[in-house]
């Protein structure tokens, strides 16, 4: 039997994560991570803290890490995080939606509204 090695990620004083799946997708040029985060006694971890922890653990630039989803179990202090680490900025721009990129960097993405032009 082969033993699966799980990587631990220190996120903050009150939160620690275990990488359950680490998939290297060479076709797209990214690394896909599935992380189980334990934050018992504290709130859900922030995207910014997750990005910093992943980038430092994997030696990646913070602007190449995208948090796809954080799902927190009610009352359990456990979250499941889905993240991608891209090889370059161009690939990230091609595959990730702009709202996710803006969400992770803290930038506001301008949406259509009253002032938006209508297609005719």
Swiss-Prot record:
InterPro entries: eRP_eS24_sf, Ribosomal_eS24, Ribosomal_eS24_CS, Ribosomal_uL23/eL15/eS24_sf. SUPFAM superfamilies: Ribosomal proteins S24e, L23 and L15e (SSF54189). One of its GO terms (molecular function) is structural constituent of ribosome. GO terms for cellular component: ribonucleoprotein complex; ribosome. It holds the Pfam family Ribosomal_S24e. Keywords: Ribonucleoprotein, Ribosomal protein. It comes from the Archaea. PANTHER family: 40S RIBOSOMAL PROTEIN S24 (PTHR10496). This is Small ribosomal subunit protein eS24. It comes from Sulfurisphaera tokodaii (strain DSM 16993 / JCM 10545 / NBRC 100140 / 7) (Sulfolobus tokodaii).
């Amino acid at each position: 039997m082969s033993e699966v090695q799980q990587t631990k990620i220190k996120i903050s004083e009150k939160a620690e994560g275990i990488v359950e799946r680490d998939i290297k997708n060479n076709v797209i040029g990214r690394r896909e991570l599935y992380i189980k985060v334990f934050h018992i006694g504290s709130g859900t971890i922030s995207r910014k803290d997750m990005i910093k922890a992943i980038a430092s653990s994997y030696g990646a630039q913070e602007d190449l890490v995208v948090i796809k989803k954080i799902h927190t179990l009610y009352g359990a202090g456990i979250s499941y995080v889905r993240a991608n680490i891209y090889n370059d900025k161009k690939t990230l721009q091609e595959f990730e939606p702009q709202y996710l990129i803006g969400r992770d960097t803290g930038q506001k993405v301008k949406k259509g509204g009253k002032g938006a032009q209508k297609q005719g």
